[in-house]
Amino acid sequence: MSRDSQPVTITGIGSVSPYGPLAGLMANAPLEPTTISAWATAGQRRAFLVPPFRPAAVVPGLKTRRLDRLSAWALVASSLAFKDAGIDLAQLDRSRVAVVFATAFGCIELTEAFYLSAAANGWHGTDPITFPETLASAPASHVAMFHGLRGPNVTVSNKYFAGESAILQAACIVRQGQADLAIVLAGEALARTLYEWYEQAHLLSPACYDANSQEAAGFIPSEGVAALVLESSTRMQERPEARNYARIISGRWAAGGHAAEIIRKMLSGSGPRLAICSSNGEPCAVSSTSSLVREVAGDDCVIAPPQAFARGLAGTGALFHFMLALSKRAGSPHGSELALMLGTTRDNGFAALLLELP
């Protein structure tokens, strides 16, 4: 996605997270993991969990009885994002509204239940109604059906950069005229099998087991769904009252290669003053992200490190990294500036977005 195309603007934010269901930015407040009680554990196990709530109390008329929590959260987060953007879908051509969803594990709770039922009862003993909900694209389908959206519908998955990939995909869809606006969602729900897999892979922080332990290597698993509304420049001209959280200027994603060289070309001489670290699973300070920021943006670029909650969302934390960085930025005086949102992997892979913040 190059700088030659018209920018796409982020005009609405919604989320379901350990902070609860929210429209707009989350509070810039400390967040502590809670003890898992949804399943039996051998000793204390902690994670950043979404507190129980009734989706219909947030979005009147919403029915979620047969849905996985991930799909229910996607419906709530998308509704809150549209509300925050001030968009009345009844006034739009809904065939021009795209849905892009990012997930690493999909509807893991119903998938877990389906396969455990098959293991216990055989394939003939499984519930056929449950099977469609095991598809990773189920949340995006539910969002489209609930809101009556008939534009492009895409689900992406990536080990490291699913969230960034979703933003890039949605921005390209809007820029290429395939849609006038897009709702971008990313997130995960925690289940016993996923948490235990993290343990077996030795990926977890000591803080998962001891509240007094300092977080070091590893991460604390998280759950939640974030949603962003992206609008075209044409629509923004028709909506002067629309909120502007950020303009997406350009972006790149690569599985390898010379990251610094590619990002410099993307920046085209621009000097971002803020870097939003979107590294997942490890602290920004000990990842390659900080050194790459210094290489392409210099020592004067302020690095906004990710919060532990966003790092625990596998590859889908990018939207929360962005939202939490904006929340922190809102508490201090500032002017318009360029920001580089950057995530890296150990094998030279990276995802980068150049943003203009108001």
Spell out what each predicted region is.
Residues 153-157:
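Short catalytic-loop micro-motif centered on adjacent basic/acidic residues
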Residues 181-185:
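Short, well-structured beta-strand segments enriched in hydrophobic/aromatic residues
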